[in-house]
Each structure stands twice: as C-alpha cells, then as structure tokens.
Amino acid sequence: MEPERNESGTPSVAVTPAAPINAGRAPVRRVANQIPDEIAHNPLLLEAMKVLPENYNFEIPKTIWRIQQASAKRVALQMPEGLLMFACAIADIIERFTSAETVVMGDVTYGACCVDDYTAQALGADFMVHYGHSCLIPIDATHGVRMLYVFVDIKIDTSHFVDTIRFNFQAGASLALVSTVQFVSALQAARQALQTDYNVTVPQCKPLSPGEILGCTSPRLNKSVDAVVYLGDGRFHLESVMISNPDTKAYRYDPYSKVFSREYYDHSTMLRHRGEAISVATNAKTWGLILGTLGRQGSPKIMEHLESRLQALGCRYVRLLLSEIFPNKLKLFAEVEVWVQVACPRLSIDWGTAFSKPLLTPYEASVALKEAEWQLTYPMDFYANESLGPWTVNHESHRPTRATVRRTQKPEQRKLQCTDVGATVEECPCQEKVETKTE
C-alpha cells in the first residue's frame, strides 16, 4: 500500500492517538521524523556513497534529509584530522543531492570540545555537521546555526575482540570496558557476549555515553575491577582512564591492527612535575590566564571564577586568547610568573615541562590559590557533571537555572538519551530526533 504523503510530498507515518479526542476539536496527528524512502533507498545516492568505507557510518541519508528539512543554503563540515580524507567526497554528495553549498572547515579539531559553530556562522553557514565526536556541546547551545552530530560509528571485528579477552582473562574476572564514541556500539556488543563468563561493566561519566571516555574526562572505577580494557587506537584517551585509576591494570585492543597490549603510565613522574609547577605558582604575584578559542575549548565561566579568586587575593593577572598554546608564544610575556590555561588539561599534564613558566590547569591553579586540596589520584573530571569544583566546565555552579517543567511523560515512556545505557546513535536527541505535529 502506498504510504501517506504530507504537503511536501514526502512520506509520513501517522500514529493514531490512544486516548479519546474531545468533540469539536480537530484530531492531532503525530508524525515521526524519519528519513523518506526516496532518500534512504535512492539508488543514485547509494551508489555515490560507495566511495566511502563501508564500515564507517557517516549517516549520509540522514544528513541529506536534515539539510533538506532545514532548507539550508550553506553547510559547514567539521571533522578531526583522521576523517578529513573523506571531506571532499561527503561535500560532493551533499551538493549533488541538496540545494546547499558546502564549506569544509580545515582548522585542527582535537576533540568534542572543538565544535566551532562560531566560525561556521562567521562563514555564513546556516547548518553544521560535526563528525567523529559526541554531543558535548548540546544542539540547543549552538549560536545561529543548526547542528547535526554524526558519531561515525565504526564496525569492527567484534568477535576477535571478544575472543582476545577470553584468551587473556580467566572466567569470573571483573572487567571495565571503555572506548571512544566511534566504538561504543561495538563495546556494548562485546559486553553482551562476555557478561555470561565475566563481571563486565561499561562505566559512565555523564554527560558522556556509557563506556565513552575523553582525554580529560574519565570515570573512577570500583576497586573490585581487576582490569580496564580500552577499545581504540592510540593512547591519548586510554591515558585519561589510567590517570584517574592508577591502581587498576590497563590494557588496549587496537581494532585496526588487532593487537592486544598491557599499557603502563608513569604516575609518580607526572604527579611530581605537576606538584612542582603548583609549588612555584604558590608565591606568584603576576598571573596569565589563557582562554582557549579553538572551538568551544575555553570556558568563560571557569575564567570568571579564576579572575574572582585572583582579585580576592590581590594578584595581578593578564588575559590572553589563544587558539593553540606554544612555549615560544608565552615567552613573549616575560613579566608573567605563572600561566593558567582554560583549554585542555592534558596540555599541561602532557607538555607542561616544555614551558619555561608553570602552565597550570584550572584545578592546579585552584590548589595553588588555596581553594582546592591536592588529590593523590589526579582527577580527570573536566567535563563531568559530578566534578570536584568550579574549576571544571559542567560544575553545578556553572549550570543555568532551569524552570521546573511539569512531567508529561511516564518514566517508562521517556526517550533514551545518548547517555543512557543501551541507547543508540539513532535514539540520541542531539541527532534532532523530534516529533512534529500537524493539524
């Protein structure tokens, strides 16, 4: 049977209300916002998508549909370095199947904090697609441009990952599985396969998805966990969970090379270096505050908090806006005794010794300014909802006051959030999964 079509000619799915309709009032139809068949099954579009790797889900049909829905004229595409090789192909597809022109944003994108809606708007874009990261910046917080996040879920040989864990750990072991957002689906599949023989947890550090970690944000694991297994390439994200759990054995499974390795981190050296930097800063009278301008890295709220603390202590300070922070740049400010960078905590942790003056994180600055206690386990909670203090982005003191909203849905009817266990990319509200009403 031919599907019903709305005024624009696209198919719609009508859901009949279960409750009686009041007499004298026109019935209300709820129309699911789904991809029309003429886009999802367009043979020309499917053929064009073959230039992209099959195991990378760039969600092209949904992107085309969202752009058409928004009647977008200029679409900005932002992606990390590892995905830029596909940017031109995606741009060509968008321009072929929509009336929009595309702009590929070439500035470096290190992570989810680098969402650059400000630049997209300055370029005249009215729609932006950010690839490869989760929705750290909510879609309702972007300015003047509609936002679509594409996680780029990557299919891997999950069975080999599961077999590798079975080979290396005895049955009954307590394991924590973590990853980046690209492999979260594979992580959940592995958990399902392993949970009969192992005590498997997929820890969550909200607002991140279950199992997802960032280079600056990772959960604290229960002491009963025997080992944490990271699914992904590289060490940057893995080191985050290692720093926040120094007593837990860490392993890495590279889904590309299929190599499984035990990983180590020099906690004592890191803590010594950071402690020395804090000690030097304790007696400083002239401070430099750096607000990162690479996308949304910088937090004005943290900046304001640091300024108020320095003012209360009678310390002088200078503000500096930088998209990237290099030692030679900071050497130009000889009068500054200590720097605090509100950008990426890992810059100080990983590269702090490369700078001639102490380069502190907001947390370390709070310790030096006698506001926070030094933690023997270094906190990796920069974007965590439950953090130690106002030197983190999502601390409760920085959240806007929200009016109480009457609950209209029963608890069991609540839509899955991307931070819920078992939620999929398609169910995430940041993907603009909404319902529209037609009279």
Curated annotation (Swiss-Prot):
<comment type="function">
    <text>Catalyzes the first step of diphthamide biosynthesis, a post-translational modification of histidine which occurs in elongation factor 2. Dph1 and dph2 transfer a 3-amino-3-carboxypropyl (ACP) group from S-adenosyl-L-methionine (SAM) to a histidine residue, the reaction is assisted by a reduction system comprising dph3 and a NADH-dependent reductase.</text>
</comment>
<keyword id="KW-0411">Iron-sulfur</keyword>
<dbReference type="GO" id="GO:0120513">
    <property type="term" value="C:2-(3-amino-3-carboxypropyl)histidine synthase complex"/>
</dbReference>
<keyword id="KW-0949">S-adenosyl-L-methionine</keyword>
<dbReference type="InterPro" id="IPR016435">
    <property type="entry name" value="DPH1/DPH2"/>
</dbReference>
<feature type="binding site">
    <location>
        <position position="344"/>
    </location>
    <ligand>
        <name>[4Fe-4S] cluster</name>
    </ligand>
</feature>
<keyword id="KW-0408">Iron</keyword>
<dbReference type="GO" id="GO:0005737">
    <property type="term" value="C:cytoplasm"/>
</dbReference>
<dbReference type="GO" id="GO:0051539">
    <property type="term" value="F:4 iron, 4 sulfur cluster binding"/>
</dbReference>
<dbReference type="InterPro" id="IPR042265">
    <property type="entry name" value="DPH1/DPH2_3"/>
</dbReference>
<dbReference type="GO" id="GO:0005634">
    <property type="term" value="C:nucleus"/>
</dbReference>
<feature type="binding site">
    <location>
        <position position="216"/>
    </location>
    <ligand>
        <name>[4Fe-4S] cluster</name>
    </ligand>
</feature>
<comment type="pathway">
    <text>Protein modification; peptidyl-diphthamide biosynthesis.</text>
</comment>
<dbReference type="InterPro" id="IPR042263">
    <property type="entry name" value="DPH1/DPH2_1"/>
</dbReference>
<comment type="similarity">
    <text>Belongs to the DPH1/DPH2 family. DPH1 subfamily.</text>
</comment>
<keyword id="KW-0808">Transferase</keyword>
<keyword id="KW-0479">Metal-binding</keyword>
<protein>
    <recommendedName>
        <fullName>2-(3-amino-3-carboxypropyl)histidine synthase subunit 1</fullName>
        <ecNumber>2.5.1.108</ecNumber>
    </recommendedName>
</protein>
<dbReference type="GO" id="GO:0046872">
    <property type="term" value="F:metal ion binding"/>
</dbReference>
<dbReference type="InterPro" id="IPR042264">
    <property type="entry name" value="DPH1/DPH2_2"/>
</dbReference>
<feature type="binding site">
    <location>
        <position position="113"/>
    </location>
    <ligand>
        <name>[4Fe-4S] cluster</name>
    </ligand>
</feature>
<comment type="subunit">
    <text>Component of the 2-(3-amino-3-carboxypropyl)histidine synthase complex composed of dph1, dph2, dph3 and a NADH-dependent reductase.</text>
</comment>
<keyword id="KW-0539">Nucleus</keyword>
<keyword id="KW-0963">Cytoplasm</keyword>
<dbReference type="GO" id="GO:0017183">
    <property type="term" value="P:protein histidyl modification to diphthamide"/>
</dbReference>
<dbReference type="Pfam" id="PF01866">
    <property type="entry name" value="Diphthamide_syn"/>
</dbReference>
<dbReference type="GO" id="GO:0090560">
    <property type="term" value="F:2-(3-amino-3-carboxypropyl)histidine synthase activity"/>
</dbReference>
